[in-house]
């Protein structure tokens, strides 16, 4: 199987420069990623995902540094015990946004049907994200509806069917959560990468 990428009608409207440092946006014709033969630095390449790196890394994330939404996992692989009383660490969505020079860019990760996204917090393996990813949407103006689910004022691009390309969901063959420290947890690499303004793990999974 392969992913389905859907671009909005306004996807190509952000090719200008932003902020006092003149950070480059993206050209719609470059899609998610277009190789620039003059560089091997991901954020210097062409396309939306490298531009996401450039903009999201320096954005102000105070409005939404990252949060779960939707139904919580009733039976997580890693039970948080006491730590679970300190917040919400699972859901069917994980979203974050950041504002830079008037561009309020964000992403929403949706769990695959019947799955949940989870964060282990201080339980072992600590600070690890797992769960099967179904889709990721990037957009502008992150909002929550009356049920607490995230959506965008303006969607830019959605990547669907991520659960069909062999990602491990952050779980090994024994059904155990793969520690983030191994570098082998696809879900953690993608979601935590996006949270930190690094879409290279997502592109590596797609490429």
Where are the regions that the model predicts?
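RTX-like calcium-binding, glycine/aspartate-rich low-complexity repeat tracts
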Residues: 1-207
């Amino acid at each position: 199987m392969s992913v389905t990428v859907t671009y909005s009608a306004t996807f190509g409207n952000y090719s200008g420069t932003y902020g006092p440092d003149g950070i480059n946006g993206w050209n719609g014709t470059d899609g998610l990623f277009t190789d620039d033969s003059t560089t091997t630095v991901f954020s210097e390449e062409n396309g939306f995902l490298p531009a996401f790196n450039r903009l999201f890394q320096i954005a102000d994330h105070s409005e939404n540094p990252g949060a779960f939404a939707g139904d919580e996992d009733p039976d997580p692989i890693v039970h948080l015990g006491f730590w679970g009383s300190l917040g919400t660490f699972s859901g069917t969505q994980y979203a974050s946004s950041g504002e830079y020079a008037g561009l309020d860019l964000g992403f929403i990760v949706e769990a695959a049907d019947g799955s949940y996204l989870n964060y282990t917090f201080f339980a072992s393996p600590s600070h690890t994200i797992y769960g099967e990813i179904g889709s990721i949407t990037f957009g502008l103006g992150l909002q929550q509806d009356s049920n607490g689910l995230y959506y965008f004022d303006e969607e830019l691009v959605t990547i669907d069917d991520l659960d069909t390309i062999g990602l491990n969901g952050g779980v090994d063959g024994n059904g155990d959560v793969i520690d983030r420290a191994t570098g082998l947890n696809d879900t953690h690499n993608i979601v935590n990468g996006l949270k930190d303004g690094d879409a290279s793990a997502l592109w590596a999974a797609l490429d």
